Amino acid sequence: MSLMDPLANALNHISNCENVGKNTAYLKPASKLIGRVLKVMQDQGYIGNFEYIEDGKAGVYKVTLIGQINKCGAVKPRFAVKNQEFEKFEKRYLPAKGFGLLIVSTPKGLMTHDEAKDSGIGGRLISYIY
């Protein structure tokens, strides 16, 4: 049986590993989208280092956890969001204003919702983290 949503599976695995108190998480299968989401999470200080490990199949990401994640998950369906509509989705997915972030796929690549607001562009919601 094939995996339906690798990104949702990876984010759920990270959240579960954080709840249990593990220091590392191994995300399999690896993809470019998962790597870009991990890069945004690393830039914002939610995870430590991560590395791609080739296993002869789909690859694995080894993620170092630093205990900063309360919850993270994928947004399904991937809503199209205009620049002015981010606040509506902040209320829906984040516990408080200014706490946590939404990861958005824009024409300029993956970025946080704050960066997208500052750039004046919209996109599709990929995931949330706080």
Swiss-Prot record:
The keyword Zinc does not apply. Pfam families: Ribosomal_S8 (PF00410). One of its GO terms (molecular function) is rRNA binding. GO terms for cellular component: ribonucleoprotein complex; ribosome. One of its GO terms (biological process) is translation. Belongs to the universal ribosomal protein uS8 family. This is Small ribosomal subunit protein uS8. The gene is rps8.
